[in-house]
From Swiss-Prot:
Domain RNase H type-1 as annotated: residue spans: 1020-1143
Region: Interaction with membrane phosphatidylinositol 4,5-bisphosphate, residue numbers: 73-77
Entry protein name: Gag-Pol polyprotein
All residue ranges annotated as the Peptidase A2 domain in the record: 507-576
Region (Interaction with human PPIA/CYPA and NUP153): 189-227
Length: 1434
């Protein structure tokens, strides 16, 4: 035993002996269990020494676990003991064996997930897909099951909601799990409308397909029989392969996972798109100083999802970057939490940090420490504040329950529930008088006369029944058929206090269904009385009993016994309540309230109420009083700081008012909701049913309670006239109209409520859109109607009424704007108005009506009517109808005269869609299952680009119809299109990636779609080659277009009011016009090439239309592009030809300005040439003709480039005055000043002034006494300047400053007559020299050059710093097509767009976006105690 007892020592043994054998049991593990286990291990031929370590226990567990299923009880006990021991070794606390086993299970599950993840990351998972689009049928063949409409719909919705944000990629990946290329193309096609994105995607797919073909060359020779061909790039993209081939590749042995490969290509493309739409790196996500932590976490994870990294790297980012990039307030808290904190803990800890409440809390803590003493000192002024006491029993202030004289309330005083007393209550706040005990949620509601008691409004309420109370519980009423009484309702949100009349006196009394007797205080009643004692809460009270007293309550009379005595509150007990038919109604409306929050960091709306007219205030007061009675709204006090404006409008065609609340501000601040329904149901998707009913839910929103915590934000105020009293404040208890959450919450409640009914009655179809219900079944009408009543009962139980007024039993049914008949449907009758003048608003309504009608009336057009609305016009502007619009309207009227019907969908038959071209870019289509029985029709007239052709438009129509088919019926129809197969093939070979068309056949309905011309892919040998070009002047709008041919012909035409793009097109048009039936054209315009290569057959541009006409007449045309201005033969010549007089004429208007400037500043020719765009010849001519400048010709000064901190100083003399000149050697920049005397003091002062303006490191002077003086040395020492001296008597050592002195004197001479004093002329000359003379290095002026030199110097130094720092970084990177991160490599250089790295002695350039740069923390990284420092990239 001794040997084995050493398995656990000290602390571990203590922990072992605390663990129970079974949960809740008394027996615990002892040393004997370890000894037993070691003996047992020997029996199983396992080494007992393994028990001493964690690793050993793990190995034993691995050996024993597989045999547990078949092992004996002893084996299981042994396994359990070892699992517990394994956790004791790891110092992980477990309370009993079961907990240890659960932990093990969890650990193994996690491990399994990781390994699965790893295998998935390594490559495409083996075996068949996870989503199972490919299934094995009973014969063992692999068959394809196409993507479900739900999947496609989800995908479309993702793109609509998220555009191309990072979440799109994981969503795509999940939705397309295991899909074939054909499925993937279907997915892409459903979002084909996003053309720019699809174009980018297409380019990526093309590149990847080309790369695939390069890496997988075709094997020579025929394919051996029985062997499959290898897929090419276009096969993988699903364009040149059939579905059968794709399945065969994916399921062969070994498989070629074409679906996964194509998916990888698409994801590469989506990555590019995402980067374009939201270019954010995870390193840039930093928490703002006042940003709530929750928002920061949302942004962080949103970006993290988009990062292309393995799970490990992402895990690392979460652990380090999340904390690191938090703001200082949150970072302090997060660091205190320690490294192992979960995200939940972090969120909780950082809640409210940085916000005003957080600051206030910190301030309050500080204040409480500082001011506690001060408050105590002032205490003598008053004898401590008395705490106001309140009675638990009656709710009045001033006494406690023990001394209360009111009748004793039953149940707990704190929560109001029976079955326990207050001392045992678990509830925290006293809640007795808000009797919302049984139902924590929900509200009272209005009940119409037909409503029954089973109606269950959503809260406990008292109902006082009117009329003949002798009816036993008004039984007839209960059936919902009897008299139509409207009961007063008293909700229990406040105490049910009413005004009663007793013996002609008015009193307030509490309706108390828990009291047997009626007890009143302080009232004198006539007649005899008997003394009586009754038991109350505070003991017994003496009362006088009066019999046969008449009381009037809520307009109902009752006669009975009344007790008069010292009761704290007047009580009407059951003896009276039963007489007036008062009942307590418990709701059965457990509609759960949906919890709603504001957006993080936002507060409720605080919008002031605007003034209202008297009649509106009256109307609103009435409406709100009514709503309050019904429990839809409640009054609130001034403690609620929120407000939303309210106003009133007249109802349509009525004198009644409607209350409108302007919830725009609250809507901005409310969280977002997922719209439960993505669109409106369409009748063409309904299956034909024998019996149909249409119902409408009454007061839909007001039947659903609003989350209690959210109600305060819906507060609004009814103002008073002339502000004579404060406004009345209310808040909503139910879903308000106009609030953004109402539709989603109502619909989800409705779905939950209908679910049990749908389950019980699967044969009944219920379409629910908001409060419209369509119920169809194949039952005979009697049974059907019985089911309808069941449904109405079911809805009533939840508090939803279905008013008879809107209950449609007989066809035709009006539903959602449609008219439904038993075997056909149409849109509700459409009346087009006849008007003499039309406003913008009228035309908008007209177009809306026609669009609505077009879903069943084929041939409706609105193009010309829409044209009338172009431009920004006011709604009331009158618009004259054009002749085309008149004609279009007349045609539409004709079409609408004959009523047209659609039929219903039969799932057993195929869907067929037929498309016709109507001309003028308008298309019409019909979807049917049997000829001449359309399910629905539609039109398409959207032009996506300025230049288009019919084939392109046809593909757009097909995509629209396919999407519609998926949404309504869940499948794509077969298409019948007016285009020949050959025409389609020609177009499609060029454009297959951008367009996908499902199964289709040719149908000969003119006009047929055709390609009118074709461009050659190779130059035409023997045809004349035209080099074309155009140029235009932006200011004058004048231009030229022309060509030169390889046969020496040339032509140029002048154009007015044109642009560069137009002239390029004009030149092509000239070439086509002047050439034979075959022609080669070379242009340098990408714009023109792009338009013509897309084969347009119509365009909004007149010139493009002319080009199209010319192209149609040619036999063969080849069009090619060359880059401009690259000296390419014919292109360069034609460029010169069209440019003369256009591009170079521009300098003429610059000459005058240049001459004017030269007269002022005498700038040199280089400065003028660059500032005024003058040719050098002209600029030199200006200098030559100036009498002051041609004396000595141009000064030459090409400096030697010296280090940036050196200046030369010297004194020169002019007009008997001393000028001190400093020159920046490297740039030739001058600072100069007239000084009173040549002394050390003046020189020192000048040097300090210079050092304050520029970085001066070294000054170079001659040996003059002023420069060698002690004062100058002191100034140089203070400013950190090194002083150097020239060689005595050798003026060349001061060469730079000497030549500058000459130059300066020359300039002073040129401007001297413009200034009175020499010192002014010196500064003018300095300005001219520094900024008006260009030349030397870089053709800069001296001022530009000094700035450039200093900036370059700073950058170079920074770079040096970076290079030394950069050694501390490591780079993780991805190669061109491999998605796995490699590294770490050494960082050699980091630029804007790329980084240079060293990976195993190989130097690589990696695009910036494919590299992650991480600080290298050395070996300690591995330790637990490592605290990572800054992670950003320098």
């Amino acid at each position: 035993m001794g040997a084995r007892a050493s398995v656990l020592s000290g602390g571990k043994l203590d922990a072992w002996e605390k663990i129970r054998l079974r949960p809740g049991g008394k027996k615990k593990y002892r040393l004997k269990h370890i000894v037993w286990a070691s003996r047992e291990l020997k029996r199983f031929a396992l080494n007992p020494g393994l028990l001493e370590t964690t690793e050993g226990c793990k190995k034993i567990i691995g050996q024993l676990q597989p045999s547990l299923q078949t092992g004996s009880e002893e084996l299981k006990s042994l396994f359990n003991t070892i699992v517990v021991l394994y956790y004791v070794h790891q110092k992980i606390e477990v309370r009993d064996t079961k907990e240890a086993l659960d932990k093990l299970q969890e650990e193994q599950d996690k491990h399994q997930q990781k390994t699965q993840q790893a295998t998935a990351d390594k490559g495409v998972s083996k075996g068949v897909s996870q989503n199972y689009p490919i299934l094995q049928n009973l014969q063992g063949q692999m068959v394809h099951q196409s993507l479900s409409p739900r999947t496609l719909n989800a995908w479309v919705k993702v793109i609509e909601e998220k555009a191309f944000s990072p979440e799109v990629i994981p969503m795509f990946s999940a939705l397309s799990e295991g899909a074939t290329p054909q499925d993937l193309n279907t997915m892409l096609n459903t979002v084909g409308g996003h053309q720019a994105a699809m174009q980018m995607l297409k380019d990526t797919i093309n590149e990847e397909a080309a790369e695939w073909d390069r890496l997988h060359p075709v094997h020579a020779g025929p394919i051996p029989p029985g062997q499959m061909r290898e897929p090419r790039g276009s096969d993988i993209a699903g364009t040149t392969s059939t579905l059968q081939e794709q399945i065969a590749w994916m399921t062969s042995n070994p498989p070629v996972p074409v679906g996964e490969i194509y998916k990888r290509w698409i994801i590469l493309g989506l990555n590019k798109i995402v980067r374009m739409y939201s270019p954010v790196s995870i390193l840039d996500i930093k928490q703002g100083p006042k940003e709530p932590f929750r928002d920061y976490v949302d942004r962080f994870f949103k970006t993290l999802r988009a990062e292309q990294a393995t799970q490990e790297v992402k895990g690392w980012m979460t652990e380090t970057l999340l904390v690191q990039n938090a703001n200082p307030d949150c970072k302090t808290i997060l660091k205190a939490l320690g490294p192992g904190a979960t995200l939940e803990e972090m969120m909780t800890a950082c809640q409210g940090v940085g916000g005003p409440s957080h600051k206030a809390r910190i301030l309050a803590e500080a204040m409480s420490k500082a001011t506690g003493a001060a408050i105590m000192m002032q205490k003598s002024n008053f004898k401590g504040q008395r705490r106001i006491v309140k009675c638990f029993n009656c709710g009045k202030e001033g006494h406690i329950a023990r001394n209360c004289r009111a009748p004793r309330k039953r149940g707990c005083w704190k929560c109001g529930q029976e079955g326990h007393q207050m001392k045992d209550c678990t509830e925290r706040q006293a809640n007795f008088f808000r009797e919302n005990v049984a139902f924590q949620q929900g509200e009272a509601r209005k009940f119409s006369s037909e409503q029954t008691r089973a109606n269950s409004p959503a809260s406990r309420e008292l109902r006082v029944r009117g009329g003949d109370s002798s009816l036993p519980e008004a039984g007839a009423e209960r059936q919902g058929t009897g008299s139509s009484l409207d009961f007063p309702q008293i909700t229990l949100w406040q105490r049910p206090v009413v005004t009663i009349k007793v013996g002609g006196q008015l009193r307030e009394a509490l309706l108390d269904t828990g009291a047997d007797d009626t007890v009143l205080e302080d009232i004198n009643l006539p007649g005899k009385w008997k003394p009586k004692m009754i038991g109350g809460i505070g003991g017994f009270i003496k009362v006088r009993q009066y019999d046969q007293v008449s009381i009037e309550i809520c307009g109902q009379k009752a006669i009975g016994t009344v007790l008069v005595g010292p009761t704290p509150v007047n009580i009407i007990g059951r003896n009276m309540l039963t007489q007036i038919g008062c009942t307590l109604n418990f709701p059965i409306s457990p509609i759960e309230t949906v919890p709603v929050k504001l957006k993080p960091g936002m507060d409720g709306p605080k919008v002031k109420q605007w003034p209202l007219t008297e009649e509106k205030i009256k109307a609103l007061t009435e409406i709100c009083t009514e709503m309050e009675k019904e429990g839809k709204i409640s009054k609130i006090g001034p403690e609620n700081p929120y407000n939303t404006p309210v106003f009133a409008i007249k109802k349509k065609d009525s004198t009644k008012w409607r209350k409108l609340v302007d919830f725009r501000e609250l809507n901005k601040r409310t969280q977002d909701f997922w719209e439960v329904q993505l669109g409106i149901p369409h009748p063409a998707g309904l299956k034909k049913k024998r019996s149909v009913t249409v119902l409408d839910v009454g007061d839909a929103y007001f039947s659903v309670p609003l989350d209690k915590e959210f109600r305060k934000y819906t507060a609004f105020t009814i103002p008073s006239i002339n502000n004579e009293t404060p406004g009345i404040r209310y808040q909503y208890n139910v879903l308000p109209q106009g609030w953004k959450g109402s539709p989603a919450i109502f619909q989800s409640s409705m779905i939950k409520i209908l679910e049990p009914f749908r389950k019980e009655n699967p044969e009944i179809v219920i379409y629910q859109y908001m409060d419209d219900l369509y119920v169809g079944s194949d039952l005979e009408i009697g049974q059907h109607r019985a089911k309808i009543e069941e449904l109405r009962e079911h809805l009533l139980r939840w508090g939803f009424t279905t008013p008879d007024k809107k209950h449609q039993k007989e066809p035709p049914f009006l539903w959602m704007g449609y008219e439904l008949h038993p075997d056909k449907w149409t849109v509700q009758a459409i009346q087009l108005p006849d008007k003499s003048s039309w406003t913008v608003n009228d035309i908008q309504k007209l177009v809306g009506k026609l669009n609505w009608a077009s879903q069943i009336y084929p041939g409706i057009r609105v193009k010309h009517l829409c044209k009338l609305l172009r431009g920004t016009k006011a709604l009331t502007d009158v618009v004259p109808l054009t002749a085309e619009a008149e004609l279009e309207l007349a045609e539409n009227r004709e079409i609408l005269k004959e009523p047209v019907h659609g039929v219903y969908y039969d799932p057993s038959k195929d869907l067929i869609a037929e498309i016709q071209k109507q001309g003028h870019d308008q298309w019409t289509y019909q979807i049917y299952q049997e000829p001449h029985k359309n399910l629905k029709t539609g039109k398409y007239a959207r032009r996506k680009s300025a230049h288009t052709n019919d084939v392109k438009q046809l593909t757009e129509v097909v995509q629209k119809v396919a999407t519609e088919g998926i949404v309504i019926w869940g499948k794509v129809p077969k298409f019948r299109l007016p285009i020949q197969k050959e025409t389609w093939e020609i177009w499609w070979t060029e454009y297959w990636q951008a367009t996908w068309i499902p199964e289709w056949e040719f149908v000969n309905t003119p006009p047929l779609v055709k390609l009118w011309y074709q461009l050659e892919t190779e130059p035409i040998i023997g045809a004349e080659t035209f080099y074309v070009d155009g140029a235009a002047n932006r200011e004058t709008k004048l231009g030229k277009a022309g060509y030169i041919t390889d046969r020496g012909r040339q032509k140029v035409v002048s154009l007015t009011e044109t642009t560069n793009q137009k002239t390029e097109l004009q030149a092509i048009q000239l070439a086509l016009q002047d050439s034979g039936s075959e022609v080669n054209i070379v242009t340098d315009s990408q714009y023109a090439l792009g338009i013509i290569q897309a084969h347009p057959d119509k365009s909004e541009s007149e010139i493009v239309n002319q080009i199209i006409e010319q192209l149609i007449q040619k036999e063969r045309v080849y069009l090619s592009w060359v880059p401009a201005h690259k000296g390419i033969g014919g292109n360069e010549q034609v460029d010169k030809l069209v440019s003369t007089g256009i591009r170079k004429v521009l300098f003429l208007d610059g000459i005058d300005k240049a001459q004017e400037e030269h007269e002022k500043y005498h700038s040199n020719w280089r400065a003028m040439a660059s500032d005024f765009n003058l040719p050098p010849v002209v600029a030199k001519e200006i200098v030559a003709s100036c009498d002051k400048c041609q004396l000595k010709g141009e000064a030459m000064h090409g400096q030697v480039d010296c280090s940036p901190g050196i200046w030369q100083l010297d004194c020169t003399h002019l007009e008997g005055k001393i000028i001190l000149v400093a020159v920046h050697v490297a740039s030739g920049y001058i600072e100069a000043e007239v000084i009173p005397a040549e002394t050390g003091q003046e020189a020192a002062y000048f040097i300090l002034k210079l050092a304050g303006r520029w970085p001066v490191k070294i000054i170079h002077t001659d040996n003059g006494s002023n420069f060698t003086s002690a004062v100058v040395k002191a100034a140089c020492w203070w400013a950190g300047i090194q002083q150097e001296f020239g060689i005595p008597y050798n003026p060349q050592s001061q060469g730079v400053v000497e030549s500058m002195n000459k130059e300066l004197k020359k300039i002073i001479g040129q401007v001297r007559d413009q200034a009175e004093h020499l010192k002014t002329a010196v500064q003018m000359a300095v300005f001219i020299h520094n900024f008006k003379r260009k030349g030397g290095i870089g053709g800069y002026s001296a001022g530009e050059r000094i700035i450039d030199i200093i900036a370059t110097d700073i950058q170079t130094k920074e770079l040096q710093k970076q290079i030394s720092k950069i050694q501390n970084f490591r780079v993780y990177f991805r190669d061109s097509r491999d998605p796995v991160w490699k590294g770490p490599a050494k960082l050699l250089w980091k630029g804007e767009g790329a980084v240079v790295i060293q990976d195993n002695n190989e130097i690589k350039v990696i695009p910036r976006r494919k590299a992650k740069i991480i600080r290298d923390y050395g070996k300690q990284m591995a330790g637990d105690d490592c605290v990572a420092g800054r992670q950003d990239e320098d």
